[in-house]
Amino acid sequence: MSDAQQITLIVDGEETKVTEGTTGAELFFERRDVVVARVNGVLKDLDQVLTEGADVEGVTIDSPDGLNVLRHSTAHVMAQAVQQLRPEAKLGIGPYITDGFYFDFDVADPFTPEDLRTLEKMMQKIINQNQKFVRRVVTEEEAREAMANEPYKLELLGKKNDASDAAEGVNVEVGAGDITIYDNVDRKSGESIWCDLCRGPHLQNTKIISNAFALTRSSAAYWLGNQNNQQLQRIYGTAWPTKEALKAYQERIAEAERRDHRKLGVELDLFSFPDELGSGLPVFHPKGGIIRKAMEDYSRQRHVDAGYEFVYTPHITKGHLYEVSGHLDWYKDGMFPAMQVDAEFNEDGSVRKPAQDYYLKPMNCPMHNLIFRSRGRSYRELPLRLFEFGSVYRYEKSGVVHGLTRVRGMTQDDAHIYCTREQMKDELTTTLNFVLGLLKDYGLDDFYLELSTKNEEKFVGDDAAWEEATRTLSEVAEASGLHLVPDPGGAAFYGPKISVQAKDALGRTWQMSTIQLDFNLPERFELEYQAADGTRQRPVMIHRALFGSVERFMGVLTEHYAGAFPAWLAPVQVVGIPVAETFNDYMFDVVGQLKAAGIRAEVDISSDRFPKKIRTASKDKIPFVLIAGGEDAEAGAVSFRFRDGSQDNGVPVAEAVRRIVDAVKNRES
């Protein structure tokens, strides 16, 4: 073979010569786990021809990108099956998502669980046919002809140049560059059986999907996520490289369902969501109130120890405040509509004094700025750390409201720190360490950081200030030693932020604390302090929410602990169960000693039999159960029964009280 017929590639970091016209499939022929190629940083189908000098990397099916391709291809197979089952179905979008995929359809009737099982069988037949995924580049006219019976696809073609801004999932269909259609091609006849407008890439064939997939649920969804659009039916599914991986995922999902805080909230009588109040507005029951108070009390004391000062602000304010802050320009869609009040009328009904717009506050920062500005400030007062458990209200769309983790009325553990530029870096470091330490005290200890930077379409202030703020946050994050992940364009309009991402007991990631650096609001509110040289200077402002919101944090902890809260948070820390009614007085005396020591303890004197009382305590996830019978009463002792079913008999009452008090004091899990 002459050199003229060969080209040079960089394959997985090494220079390699191959025959001109070689495809990714040929290059990685011996690596059966490679499903697509990353060519010069862009994912490509394996059947695309490689060119001189290309930097090529094989992407395996079990890698994050490989899993996304697997799931996107499975979504195509599902859509093909749906249009076989319901030929009248019109296609929406069908992207991959975390751990799975979905596809939207315009159909007359919602899909039933029986439909999903039928579709799974039809999908398996398609997979077994080993259909090929074939990419073809088309003109817009050709695309419109191919999609003539798909009105939603035709609409997407009209959004080609701004697909990234249209809605989640749209850019898997159209975007910058070529318009492409993927055909599912019959291997024997070579004919296209089904096609979809799609940017790809895809697997080479359906058989790679194997049988490690499942359709999980269906729901209603508005076209492009806009509630003013047509309501479609969405089918969710998942796909994995092996049946074992699918089973492991399904087991994780089953465990997550058992831990669902909405379910546990009912079972443990912690909180509820009355329809009479409206979507996203929870109420806490007495037991939930105990947990919440314990969370807040501990946080409050830690803030006092760290030099924070407590403030309180109202729930509503004049709209002008949010004009100054910029929220009405940049965040109005997330706010509840204005209330018009204080209008005055003449006797003839004409307006003597027009009404003013008042808003439920979506954030506490503007009000904290007014506190800072209420009098002259000196550099000697800085850093000034203001803290509030502040109630805020945000108009979340009904479709995204979810239990306690996405609500419309919430309480933020909100701090705003005002400091000099010289203090800025040290204060950020101190704040991050404080945040991480406090989260660990609540039982979360697996973290990484995310750095959200400027959204070029949505920001206030000058580029230099943003660059300085971003650089400083990045240095502080890197110095923490935690893994740092970029979040380009994810910042709020007034400044970049670090967010602490925490993993729970199931390995799921939750965004917890946020630390945001802001040079802009001090400018907009004309905040000043007198510097050591007598000049007036602008402070730097740090926004910090540790829990995110109290409601959300409680939802996360409920699932993290599966409702079995550590003793210091548990609403009932001890239940005393006498073996027989004869020992009720003895157990009341023991529980009285515990209550005197500050322990939340009860005696179960219900008419239930002893075994039922034990089961009830277990179901209620009580940390400590104390049992007393004849031998215990004679010896001045009790028997400990723990959550795991183990038991420690004959423990002297004084020692039992000490053990429990120590466990609560030390916040043992």
UniProtKB/Swiss-Prot annotation:
SMART domains tied to this protein: tRNA_SAD
Entry cofactors: Zn(2+)
Assembly notes: Homodimer.
Annotated Gene3D superfamilies: 3.30.54.20, Anticodon-binding domain, Bira Bifunctional Protein, Domain 2, Threonyl-trna Synthetase, Chain A, domain 2
A single Gene Ontology CC term: cytoplasm
UniProt keyword Endoplasmic reticulum present: no
Subcellular location: Cytoplasm
Binding-site residues for Zn(2+), renumbered to this chain: 365, 416, 543
Gene that produces this protein: thrS
Gene Ontology biological process terms from the UniProt entry: threonyl-tRNA aminoacylation
EC number(s) from the headed UniProt entry: 6.1.1.3
Free-text function comment from the UniProt entry: Catalyzes the attachment of threonine to tRNA(Thr) in a two-step reaction: L-threonine is first activated by ATP to form Thr-AMP and then transferred to the acceptor end of tRNA(Thr). Also edits incorrectly charged L-seryl-tRNA(Thr).
Family the entry assigns: Belongs to the class-II aminoacyl-tRNA synthetase family.
Pfam families for the chain: HGTP_anticodon (PF03129), tRNA-synt_2b (PF00587), tRNA_SAD (PF07973)
GO MF annotation list: ATP binding; metal ion binding; threonine-tRNA ligase activity; tRNA binding
Source species taxonomy: Bacteria, Bacillati, Actinomycetota, Actinomycetes, Micrococcales
Region entry Catalytic, spans: 260-566
Domain TGS: 3-60
Keywords from the named record: Aminoacyl-tRNA synthetase, ATP-binding, Cytoplasm, Ligase, Metal-binding, Nucleotide-binding, Protein biosynthesis, RNA-binding, tRNA-binding, Zinc
Cofactor stoichiometry and binding remark: Binds 1 zinc ion per subunit.
Chief localisation class: cytoplasm
Enzyme class, UniProt record, top EC level: ligase
Reactions catalysed, as given in the entry: tRNA(Thr) + L-threonine + ATP = L-threonyl-tRNA(Thr) + AMP + diphosphate + H(+)
The protein's name: Threonine--tRNA ligase
